[in-house]
């Protein structure tokens, strides 16, 4: 490294080799140190990284390096979520086995991750399609099966025609497949389920433990679990021996029922309506479309059964309908319809001319009318009186229902974890003995244009258990199973005695910091929490939740374009194949495909992904500007929780900044020990040392407390520019310059580790190593006299101003304010729901 010019390519290669050689980031249990487990969501090996990956993994690496500098024992592992349908689809297209394609991609992506300088413990790398990983998943499946937490039954499931497989409810988004966008149909087939619903109450209760999770994720999980308290009411079917059971959360509206409605899968249909030709035609046409039409565009349809249900209170005959908006898999699959209280009921009754009455007063919408003995009662009193009446008459019971359903975990695919189950000649289900694990996939046989399931592998299907001829289960596990427990296996992936090493899990878990997109809030993060609770119940982990703190980073978005294929499907085009026309303000007005010169469609700025063909290869950026410039740009361009608009031109500014630092360090190194001129005043020294302490304080706070990395970088750049300007005006002592620039290098190190590694050695010699340095501490004495005027607000209204020391924390500030007599009066017997604090400026108590 003799050349004094900034050459990122040369520097980064050298530094990365050093890290590997010295095993800098390998971790082990060290009880003398405080641990910090930082985990980015593991990638699917799709072929190449794009900037969305780079953002996720850079955030994780910056946090990991920062906490190492705080003296903690940091674990930051990486692995590969390597089962999945894309591998099978590629296998068909390219006549290659899914395994070969997957491992080829892993090799490519691993090289890319290493080129970005991420401080992973590669000794703990996991590949989920490796039998050495999934054997433990198979063993846990058997344990769950024996505890009756896993079961198989014939059930109505979501079916994707394109992918030829079942989907869990969480994987159906607005009636279409979450992966390929195909419209979902329903099928009744035998499937494996895991009892996630049994844990619904624990899910909700333990959300309060997730104090450092985004509120949006907490809210999404609450809604997905969907706890509803209400009444389960028995209603007699007119001239039949049977009852219709309905569930309602609004018993006060019962006097306004104008019709009852059941789902297209309700058991009453088979009991009474099998021979009704009109109904059978209706069901044949609509039964397998679930309520996707309603979900997507609020299209309502139904049919009158010409059966009647007796109203449980006034004994009137109420018509019974079958409708697409009644969910077959929620509560009883039957509802009481009150058009004056429910918009969907109202629209349905208007569509089919079903008469209804109003039960709420025009003058006071909270008072009941047309409700017999319950007239003039308000909603609360009516609810209590009607509920008590129905319960006392033994017509109803208090009931709780959950929206969340048991997790369907079986898939009709080849490339997945084989389910460790066999079936004997008497149709008995038998678990594969532990000594026979792992059950390994058969060697892949290429079949043109055909997605495969294990049922095609006849030789593999037939086996023997304890000398008995048996047939293997042909379904594989949902790939979300692998990604639901990998974090625990990371703690010691080479452990051979059990699913998880108890010593390693006790030391490292729970995860201190988890990083991934908000799109995982109700799929991966639900399963992730669920699996941890299972592991907790089996004694494998000690904490009730898997993760203390969650960051949901925003997407990296970019201008994206497509055209339509002959079959009507979209073909997404790479930006390199497009000519773009912009107006004077830079707005895109049209785009043309270079090869055909035909107009194409601009889709706007959307998430970078392989499926949209809009990814920017980080390798090209690294070649041109270096990994440090890319890392710094990714962390500076936008706050981490919002979308980052990609623009390759903006990275140039970060590259120039690093070049300036590089050159300035060499200027300082060459500087002689000069006599101090009169112009170098003591008060000037105090100014820049004070400013440096201010910057250390701000940068530390922005990284540690706020995860505001962009503002932390802005503060570092601001101080560096100030230092350069000062250097040009004043003759500052060399030791003071070195102190200042060394502090800047330390603070930049988590963001740009390669350049900082080299500059540290240039300043302090070959034997020095920045990895052994600690995070700079600010000197409190510079702030003890400094006070800020803090505006105190309650519900956004100013109540007082207090002078408070700049150095103290938010918690200490709140303690001081709550002792203020003026504020005490306003907060007396009030509950503070939320506290909003803008450092050194405003604090707002929301009541």
Swiss-Prot record:
Q: Name the UniProt key words of this record, in alphabetical order.
A: Aminoacyl-tRNA synthetase, ATP-binding, Cytoplasm, Ligase, Nucleotide-binding, Protein biosynthesis
- Superkingdom of the source? Bacteria
CDD domains, per the entry: Anticodon_Ia_Leu_BEm, LeuRS_core
Q: Which cysteines are joined by disulfide bonds?
A: none
Any Pfam family the entry gives = tRNA-synt_1
Q: Which GO terms describe its cellular component?
A: cytosol
Where found, per UniProt?
Cytoplasm
Enzyme Commission code(s) on record? 6.1.1.4
Q: Which NCBIfam families match?
A: leuS_bact
Designated name of the protein: Leucine--tRNA ligase
Species: Buchnera aphidicola subsp. Cinara cedri (strain Cc)
């Amino acid at each position: 490294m003799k050349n004094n010019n900034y050459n990122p390519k040369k520097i980064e290669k050298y530094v990365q080799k050093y890290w590997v050689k010295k095993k800098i980031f390998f971790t082990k249990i060290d009880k003398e140190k405080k641990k910090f487990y930082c985990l980015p969501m593991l990638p699917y090996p799709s072929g190449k990284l794009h900037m969305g990956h780079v953002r996720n993994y850079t955030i994780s690496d910056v946090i990991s390096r920062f906490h190492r500098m705080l003296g903690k024992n940091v674990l930051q592992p990486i692995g590969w979520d390597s089962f999945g349908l894309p591998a099978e689809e590629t296998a068909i297209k390219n006549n290659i086995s899914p395994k070969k394609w997957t491992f080829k991609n892993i090799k490519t992506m691993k090289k890319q991750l290493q080129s970005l300088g991420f401080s992973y413990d590669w000794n703990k790398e996991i590949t989920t399609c490796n039998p050495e990983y999934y054997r433990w998943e198979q063993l846990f499946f058997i344990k769950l099966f024996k505890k009756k937490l896993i079961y198989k039954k014939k059930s109505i499931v979501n079916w994707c025609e394109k992918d030829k497989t079942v989907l869990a409810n969480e994987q159906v988004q607005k009636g279409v497949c979450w992966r390929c966008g195909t419209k979902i149909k329903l099928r009744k087939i035998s499937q494996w389920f895991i009892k996630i619903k049994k844990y619904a109450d624990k899910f909700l209760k333990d959300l309060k433990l997730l104090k450092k999770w985004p509120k949006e994720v907490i809210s999404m999980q609450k809604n997905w679990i969907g706890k509803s308290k209400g009444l389960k009411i028995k209603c007699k079917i007119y001239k039949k021996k049977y009852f219709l059971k309905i569930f309602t959360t609004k018993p006060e509206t019962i006097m306004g029922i104008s019709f009852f409605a059941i789902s297209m899968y309700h058991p009453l249909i088979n009991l009474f309506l099998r021979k009704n030709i009109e109904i059978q035609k209706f069901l044949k046409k609509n039964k397998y479309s679930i309520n996707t039409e309603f979900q997507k565009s609020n299209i309502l349809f139904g049919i009158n059964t010409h059966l009647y249900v007796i109203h449980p209170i006034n004994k009137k005959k109420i018509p019974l309908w079958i409708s697409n908006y009644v969910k077959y898999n929620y509560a009883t699959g039957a509802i009481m319809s009150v058009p004056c209280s429910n918009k969907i009921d109202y629209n349905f009754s208007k569509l089919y001319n079903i008469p209804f009455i109003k039960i709420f007063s025009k003058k006071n919408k909270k008072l009941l009318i047309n409700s017999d003995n319950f007239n003039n009662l308000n909603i609360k009193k009516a609810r209590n009186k009607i509920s008590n009446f129905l319960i006392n008459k033994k017509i109803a019971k208090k009931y709780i229902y959950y929206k969340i359903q048991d997790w369907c975990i079986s898939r009709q695919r080849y490339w997945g974890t084989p389910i460790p189950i066999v079936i004997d000649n008497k149709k008995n289900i038998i678990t594969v003995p532990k000594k026979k694990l792992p059950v390994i996939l058969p060697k892949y046989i290429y079949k043109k244009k055909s997605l495969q399931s294990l049922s095609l592998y006849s030789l593999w299907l037939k086996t023997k258990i304890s000398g008995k001829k048996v047939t293997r289960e042909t379904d594989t596990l949902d790939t979300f199973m692998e990604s639901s427990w990998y974090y625990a296996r990371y703690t010691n992936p080479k452990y051979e005695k059990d699913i998880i090493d108890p010593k390693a899990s006790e030391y490292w878990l729970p995860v201190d910091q988890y990083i991934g997109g908000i799109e995982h809030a109700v799929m991966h993060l639900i399963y992730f929490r669920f699996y941890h609770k299972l592991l907790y119940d089996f004694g494998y982990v000690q904490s009730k939740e898997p993760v203390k703190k969650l960051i949901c980073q925003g997407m990296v978005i970019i201008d994206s374009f497509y055209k339509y294929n002959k079959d009507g499907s979209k073909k997404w085009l790479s930006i390199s194949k497009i000519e773009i026309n912009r107006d004077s303000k830079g707005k895109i007005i049209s785009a043309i495909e270079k090869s055909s010169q035909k107009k194409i469609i601009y889709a706007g700025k959307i998430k970078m992904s392989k499926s949209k063909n809009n990814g920017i290869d980080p390798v090209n950026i690294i070649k041109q500007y270096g990994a440090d410039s890319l890392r710094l740009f990714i962390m500076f361009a936008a706050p981490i929780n919002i979308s980052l608009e990609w623009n390759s031109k903006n990275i140039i500014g970060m590259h120039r900044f690093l070049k300036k630092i590089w050159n300035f360090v060499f200027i300082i190194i060459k500087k002689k020990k000069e006599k101090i001129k009169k112009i170098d005043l003591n008060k000037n020294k105090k100014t820049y040392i004070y400013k440096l302490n201010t910057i250390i304080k701000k940068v530390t706070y922005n990284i540690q407390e706020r995860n505001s990395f962009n503002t932390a970088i802005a503060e570092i750049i601001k101080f560096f520019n100030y230092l350069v300007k000062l250097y040009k005006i004043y003759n500052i002592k060399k030791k003071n310059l070195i102190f200042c620039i060394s502090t800047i290098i330390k603070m930049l190190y988590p963001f740009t580790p390669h350049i900082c590694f080299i500059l540290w050695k240039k300043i302090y010699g070959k034997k020095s190593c920045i990895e052994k340095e600690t995070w700079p501490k600010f000197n409190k004495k510079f702030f003890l006299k400094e006070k800020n005027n803090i505006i105190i607000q309650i519900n956004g209204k100013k109540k007082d101003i207090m002078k408070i020391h700049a150095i103290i924390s938010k918690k200490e500030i709140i303690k001081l304010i709550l002792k203020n007599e003026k504020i005490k009066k306003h907060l007396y017997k009030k509950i503070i729901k939320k506290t909003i604090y803008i450092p050194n400026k405003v604090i707002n108590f929301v009541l």
